[in-house]
Amino acid sequence: MENLNPACASEDVKNALTSPIMMLSHGFILMIIVVSFITTALAVQTLWYKNVFPFCTKNLLLSAIVNGIFHQSTVAEIRLKTVYHLIRYSNAPCSILFQSSDCFYDNFLYYQTALFSSFYCVSLFLDRLFSLNPRSFYNSHQTLGFIVFLILQIICPIAIQFWTFHDSDYTSYVPMCNYPPASSVSGTKFYFINDSRIIIMGTIFMCSLFLYIHNKSREKRMIFNVYNTDSRYKSYENFLATRAVCIIIFSQITCLGITSFVPSIFNQFRQSISPDWFHLILAFMAGATYSNFFLPLIVIYETQLIIAHRHKLIKKLKSQKEEFSDHFASLDFVWEREANKKKTQLVQ
């Protein structure tokens, strides 16, 4: 994102910030946030009371939802502050911008929660990868695994922010408090992190897809090779959890990837893009806000789907168990009858 310096906004930037399209973007984002708060409350209830995910997966999803609450609240506060600022200073181009120092805490929370959204996708993938072996050390110590993942999800974004922004110029001016502070060095670092994020998220998605395909093929093989009811049930549960996580990762990567890709493209061709369109389009590029909107919806839907599939599988396994019992009972009867015949023949 391009920063604006000095304090006075150019005519193009002022017109872009006060245009109906910009106001529409603020209203649209705020509407999404309000709806996401409602669905988030339902998703938390669903995760808390419906025990369908393994311990670590469930708590990683809860941490993602809690992070979403913080992110949506931060974005709502930034947008409302911006709308108030634009209305108050609509005719004052030298007061319409925010000084970066006034946005320090909003900026920190915005990027902390946005980067957290990327890291919990990595954690969810690793959680499902380590869960492939039901007898592994990881499956026996899921609480420890969750704590390690959570610490990394918090510390890594802080470290990235420090590296990116520690030498930034906080006396510069920006249109909104979600814009990074201005500095040629930190700007280069910002786009490097942005590009790296796209590559890493794409890699995680491809790996998640391969993991899902592997779990699906293994589940099909178990139908013909494994007759232990408990083993088959646990394998199917693991498959359903992996599928749900893959869908969640796909939605997050789609939202975060596209909205990270656009600023990177704009950065390469910013000389040929007018400032007003630059800021108008970026106003809609709220990837983490969109991903936090879809996350609770997917959690609710996948939970209900897993419950339905579990009930279906339980009925199927019970039916198969009864068929096996009848089959073995008939075999026992035949074997016993044949044994009695042989005994009779020997006596005669």
Swiss-Prot record:
Keywords: Membrane, Transmembrane, Transmembrane helix
Example of a GO MF term: G protein-coupled receptor activity
A single Gene Ontology CC term: membrane
Subcellular location: Membrane
Membrane topology label: Multi-pass membrane protein
Transmembrane segments: 28-48, 108-130, 145-165, 193-213, 246-266, 280-300
Coiled coil location: none
Superkingdom of the source species: Eukaryota
InterPro entries: 7TM_GPCR_serpentine_rcpt_Sra
Pfam families found in the cross-reference section: 7TM_GPCR_Sra
Main location: membrane
Gene Ontology biological process: sensory perception of chemical stimulus
PANTHER family, A to Z: SERPENTINE RECEPTOR CLASS ALPHA-28-RELATED, SERPENTINE RECEPTOR, CLASS A (ALPHA)-RELATED-RELATED
Similarity annotation: Belongs to the nematode receptor-like protein sra family.
Record-given protein name: Serpentine receptor class alpha-29
Gene assigned in the entry: sra-29
